[in-house]
From Swiss-Prot:
It is found in: Nucleus, Nucleolus; Cytoplasm. Component of the ribosome assembly machinery. Nuclear paralog of the ribosomal protein P0, it binds pre-60S subunits at an early stage of assembly in the nucleolus, and is replaced by P0 in cytoplasmic pre-60S subunits and mature 80S ribosomes. It comes from Chaetomium thermophilum (strain DSM 1495 / CBS 144.50 / IMI 039719). This is Large ribosomal subunit protein uL10. GO terms for cellular component: cytoplasm; nucleolus; preribosome, large subunit precursor; ribosome.
Length: 270
C-alpha cells in the first residue's frame, strides 16, 4: 500500500538559543581568566572560517580565546577606571569593535605577534565578500582555472559543466566536444567577467569562482593592541592605529536587563 502523503512528521522541538545563562557564563569566565595571564590581546578576524580558527586554538592551546558581543566583553574587562578588573585594563576596551576577540596569554608578546604575522589561509569567497580583484575568463576554450594559469599548463573544463555554466550566466557553448566562449579560437567573444574589483559578490559569482578553483578570500588575524599586567599599560599595534575605536562609555553602569537586551555571547575556548 502506498504511503499517504498526509502522513507527515512535525517536529515540535526547537534549538535553544543562547540566553542569559550563556552571557553570564562568558562574562564570569573572562573575569576569572584575567588574573591568570600576563597579557590580553584584542584581535580582529578577516573572512572568518571556523576550521582555520580551530587550528589557531590548537596551536595556542596554552592561551585562552574568547569571542562574544563586544559590549559584553568590554563590560567584563571594565570600561572605566572604577570598573576595570586590573590596573589600566579599561583602556583596552576601545579596540572592541567589529569582529574581534580576546586572547589571554603568558607568552611573550613578540612571539604572539610573530605567530599571527605569518598566519594566512586562502579560501573560496562567500556571498557578501568584496572582490579584491577583477576576474575575467578569456574567450575561446574554457579551461579549468578560468585563465588563471597559461593554457599549456591547464586542461579544458569537462563538457558536463557546460549546462551549469550556462545556468550561472556564462554564454558558453559546445564546439567539437569542448566548452567555449565565442568560437574555439576566441575570435567571436571578449571573454566573460565574473566579478570586478570592489564589488560585493553574490552567490552566483561565488559559485563560478569555486568552479574555477579561484580563491579570493584570505583568513587573517590582525592584532590591534594588548594589555600587560606587570605595567598596566596598553600597547597599540599597527593594525589598531588604522581601525575605528570604540566610543567612550556614556553610562557608568549597566543593569542586568540592559546586558540581556544588547549582548549575547559566543562560546569561549580553553
Amino acid at each position: 500500500m502506498p504511503k499517504s502523503k498526509r502522513a507527515r512528521v512535525y517536529h515540535l522541538t526547537q534549538v535553544n538559543k543562547k540566553g542569559r545563562e550563556a552571557k553570564e557564563r562568558l562574562f564570569s569566565n573572562i573575569r576569572e581568566t584575567i588574573p591568570k595571564y600576563q597579557h590580553c590581546f584584542v584581535f580582529s578576524v578577516d573572512n572568518m572560517r571556523n576550521n582555520y580558527l580551530k587550528d589557531v586554538r590548537h596551536e595556542l592551546n596554552d592561551c585562552r580565546i574568547f569571542f562574544g558581543k563586544t559590549k559584553l566583553m568590554a563590560r567584563a574587562l571594565g570600561t572605566t577606571p572604577e570598573e576595570e578588573q586590573a590596573d589600566g585594563l579599561h583602556r583596552l576596551t576601545r579596540y572592541l569593535t567589529g569582529t574581534v576577540g580576546l586572547l589571554f596569554t603568558n607568552r611573550d608578546p613578540a612571539d604572539i605577534e610573530s605567530y599571527f604575522s605569518n598566519l594566512s589561509q586562502v579560501d573560496f569567497a562567500r556571498a557578501g565578500t568584496v572582490a579584491p580583484r577583477t576576474v575575467t575568463v578569456p574567450p575561446g576554450i574554457v579551461y579549468s582555472t578560468g585563465g588563471e594559469v597559461p593554457p599549456e599548463h591547464d586542461v579544458p573544463v569537462s563538457h558536463t559543466l557546460e549546462p551549469e555554466l550556462r545556468r550561472l550566466g556564462m554564454p558558453v557553448r559546445m564546439i567539437k566536444g569542448k566548452v567555449c566562449l565565442g568560437d574555439e579560437k576566441g575570435e567571436a567573444s571578449e571573454g566573460y567577467t565574473i566579478c570586478k574589483e570592489g564589488e560585493v559578490l553574490d552567490s552566483r559569482q561565488t559559485r563560478l569562482l569555486k568552479l574555477f578553483s579561484i580563491c579570493l578570500s584570505e583568513f587573517k588575524v590582525s592584532l590591534l593592541g594588548y594589555w600587560s599586567s606587570a605595567s598596566g599599560e596598553v600597547t597599540e599595534l599597527e593594525a589598531g592605529k588604522t581601525r575605528p575605536k570604540r566610543e567612550g562609555n556614556r553610562r557608568q553602569a549597566m543593569n542586568g536587563d540592559e546586558m540581556d537586551e544588547d549582548q549575547s555571547s559566543d562560546e569561549d575556548s580553553d
